């Protein structure tokens, strides 16, 4: 019998183009193989002679991590079989065509994600084996696979929460919500490598690389690592936070337009934190990383978000008799808004019923298991007050449900409760609507309707779990029991007379109506109303007052009085932060009793409007003319204007232009050509910043067709 010639591997075709398309990774490119777990991919192996299944034995070996181990799940050895044996590593469904072998490789839906090397060992009979490298591939989570913990059974939702590479962050104030376009860019060149670089620079990996890699099959673990690594409080994470006003050593958080530049800068500088970020930047960068790794993720904004460090579900704020909001040494705050992420996953570590959206917050606010990270906390657990469930559920519950107590301070002591608000925190919880540029309110996912029996019952349930059965008496409860919070003889409201624009005088209207109360059920009262205006900081604090005003009046029973107020531009011109937020507060003192009432109005100033127009049909590789128009509607010139354009699939990186000074009342028109590189829905984002206004921002949705398409 003639001896069969040795089987040698001549070449391998990883079929990256076909596989990447079938695994929804073609947007990352087709130069290398990028696949998702729990789904087969295909190879073509070319040999020196036809493969003979009865004589030739092929063993596949896949390895990832620094010390691959089958025990740790970072090394897999599997043989060529006719039928796929189940949710395990396998090579099956092969066909022989002359000297080539087409084979289907399957990775289990609980495999470790990461960069893999793939090789085969070929032997004949009892002879020795020869090893051949096949190449490398990247393995990601697979939300299209029903067996994966991140499975999301809706193609529409998958297109939004995995494939969409742009979106919106919602900022401002609950009554002045602004949409902030953001370029996630999760499919841009090198981003996938940077995502794994983030995992590899974590403290978990530095402490025990082999163990860390072995746990990357667990989406809960990976999410917590990423949450800690987006901030730099414990490690060389991606972003350094800055909530002050001096950004001279870096970039103002308001000037970032997308995640790509941040991630590329972090990687290029060897993992040195990028300066600077605030909550919406942290959350947007985490959204990029998680979508890139294959976890359905969205960015969520919570307006009037509590930062309740002492876990008593109460936030105290203080005013003096001149209506000035006072700073305090306490770390508890009410942020104008706060931004976090939601990731979709199964929670096998929790009792049944808590799967689905989970809160993850990369902004460094408090430690969790020794590191500055937060979550995943089940949104369902937050809604039901199940604050005993992991991870960090009490902190997130307080962010959307804490009570607010407003005190009048005198002689250094809290003298009077001005308000006890049970529904002022956790307002207009928002995310981008699926398939639309509109905002969607998801407040009902986090809490029952304010004031409903269910909402108060859940609040008491969470309070008992967080504070214990021997709940200490809170100071404001003592005052409530002693009658410290009574009905008031008048109702006060502050309204804006017209839309507030930065650079214009602000016109307000005070409305006061005399109503019956227990002390003075009828008859006139005298009021002294002291007003104060302060710059409102994103973190909930204020700066020194820049405007004061006092009104004295007599108010007859049953009558309503309107009093106009003028806040001149000259008063606030150089006093505001980049967010352009103003808090106008008033303390009305009743002359007959000495008791006080509070009225508040937060004002978000509108920046000038930016217009973006595209005149032609957009095609890949063809010049696309873009027109940008800005009219300076302010009373002052905009100096040192710069324009930056960004958009995945439209621009490689960014386009920056210096525009000089734009005189008050004048219009600036810019034309430029773009050359789209990718087909499909794209978004062009434009930011014009100046010394006076940092965030004149606009966007344009553009659908790019394949070149030559009808």
Curated annotation (Swiss-Prot):
Superkingdom field: Eukaryota
Tissue distribution of the protein: Widely expressed.
Residues binding Ca(2+): 401, 403, 450, 455
Annotated active site: 279, 338, 361
Listed EC numbers: 2.3.2.13
InterPro entries with a match to the protein in the record: Ig-like_fold, Ig_E-set, Papain-like_cys_pep_sf, Transglutaminase, Transglutaminase-like, Transglutaminase-like_sf, Transglutaminase_animal, Transglutaminase_AS
Catalyzed chemical reaction(s): L-glutaminyl-[protein] + L-lysyl-[protein] = [protein]-L-lysyl-N(6)-5-L-glutamyl-[protein] + NH4(+)
Cofactor stoichiometry and binding remark: Binds 1 Ca(2+) ion per subunit.
One MF annotation (Gene Ontology) recorded for this entry: metal ion binding
Chain's role: Catalyzes the cross-linking of proteins and the conjugation of polyamines to proteins.
The family this protein is said to belong to: Belongs to the transglutaminase superfamily. Transglutaminase family.
Record protein name field: Protein-glutamine gamma-glutamyltransferase Z
């Amino acid at each position: 019998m003639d001896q069969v010639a040795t089987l040698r591997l001549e070449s391998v075709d990883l079929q990256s183009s076909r596989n990447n398309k079938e695994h929804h990774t073609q947007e990352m490119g087709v130069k290398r193989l990028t696949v998702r777990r729990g789904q087969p991919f295909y190879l073509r192996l070319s040999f020196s002679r036809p493969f003979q299944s009865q004589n030739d034995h092929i063993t596949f070996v896949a390895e990832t991590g620094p010390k691959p181990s089958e025990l740790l799940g970072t090394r897999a050895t599997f043989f060529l079989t006719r039928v796929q044996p189940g949710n395990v590593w396998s090579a099956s469904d092969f066909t022989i065509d002359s000297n080539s072998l087409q084979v289907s490789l399957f990775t289990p839906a609980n495999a470790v994600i990461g960069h893999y090397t793939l090789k085969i060992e070929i032997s004949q009979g009892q002879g020795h084996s020869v090893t051949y490298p096949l190449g490398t591939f990247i393995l990601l989570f697979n939300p299209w696979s029903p067996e994966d913990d991140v499975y999301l059974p809706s193609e529409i939702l998958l297109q939004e929460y995995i494939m969409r590479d742009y979106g919106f962050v919602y900022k401002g104030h609950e009554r002045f919500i602004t949409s902030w376009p953001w370029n996630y860019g999760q499919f841009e060149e090198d981003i996938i490598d940077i995502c794994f670089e983030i995992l590899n620079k974590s403290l978990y990996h530095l402490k025990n690389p082999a163990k860390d890699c072995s746990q990357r099959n667990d989406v809960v673990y990976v999410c917590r690592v990423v949450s800690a690594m987006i901030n730099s409080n414990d490690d060389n994470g991606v972003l350094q936070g800055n909530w002050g006003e001096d950004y001279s050593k870096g970039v103002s958080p308001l000037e970032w337009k997308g995640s790509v530049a941040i991630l590329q800068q972090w990687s290029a500088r060897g993992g040195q934190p990028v300066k600077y970020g605030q909550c919406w930047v942290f959350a947007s960068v985490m959204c990029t990383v998680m979508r890139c790794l294959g976890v359905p993720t969205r960015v969520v904004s919570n307006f009037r978000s509590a930062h309740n460090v002492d876990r008593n579900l109460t936030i105290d704020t203080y005013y003096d008799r001149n209506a000035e909001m006072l700073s305090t040494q306490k770390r508890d705050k009410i942020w104008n808004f706060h931004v976090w992420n939601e990731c979709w996953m199964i929670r096998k570590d929790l009792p049944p019923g808590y799967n689905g959206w989970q809160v993850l917050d990369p902004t460094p606010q408090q430690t969790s298991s020794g590191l500055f990270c937060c979550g995943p906390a089940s949104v369902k657990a937050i809604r039901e007050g199940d604050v005993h469930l992991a991870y960090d559920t009490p902190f997130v519950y307080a962010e959307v449900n804490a009570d607010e107590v407003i005190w009048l301070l005198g002689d250094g002591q809290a003298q009077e409760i001005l308000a006890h608000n049970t529904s002022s925190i956790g307002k207009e919880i928002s995310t981008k609507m699926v398939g639309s540029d509109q905002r969607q309110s998801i407040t009902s996912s986090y809490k029952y309707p304010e004031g409903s029996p269910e909402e108060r019952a859940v609040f008491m349930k969470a309070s008992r779990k967080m504070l214990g059965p021997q709940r200490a008496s809170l100071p404001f409860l003592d005052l409530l029991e002693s009658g410290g919070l009574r009905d008031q003889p008048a109702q006060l409201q502050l309204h804006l007379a017209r839309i507030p624009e930065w650079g214009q005088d602000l016109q307000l209207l005070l409305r006061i109506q005399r109503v019956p109360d227990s002390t003075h059920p009828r008859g006139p009262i005298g009021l002294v109303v002291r007003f104060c205006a302060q710059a409102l900081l994103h973190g909930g604090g204020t700066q020194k007052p820049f405007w004061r005003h006092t009104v004295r009046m007599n108010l007859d029973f049953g009558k309503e009085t309107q009093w106009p107020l003028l806040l001149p531009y000259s008063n606030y011109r150089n006093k505001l932060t980049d967010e352009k937020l103003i808090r106008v507060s008033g303390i009305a003192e009743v002359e007959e009793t000495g008791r006080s009432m509070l009225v508040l109005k937060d004002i978000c100033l509108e920046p000038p409007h930016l217009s973006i127009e595209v005149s032609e049909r957009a095609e890949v590789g063809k010049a696309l003319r873009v027109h940008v128009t800005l009219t300076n509607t302010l009373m002052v010139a905009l100096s040192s204007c710069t324009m930056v354009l960004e958009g995945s699939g439209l621009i490689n990186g960014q386009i920056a232009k210096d525009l000089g000074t734009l005189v008050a009342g004048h219009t600036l028109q810019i034309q430029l050509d773009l050359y789209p590189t990718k087909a499909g829905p794209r978004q062009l984002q434009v930011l014009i910043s100046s010394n006076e206004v940092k965030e004149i921002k606009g966007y344009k949705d553009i659908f790019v067709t394949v070149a030559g398409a009808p």
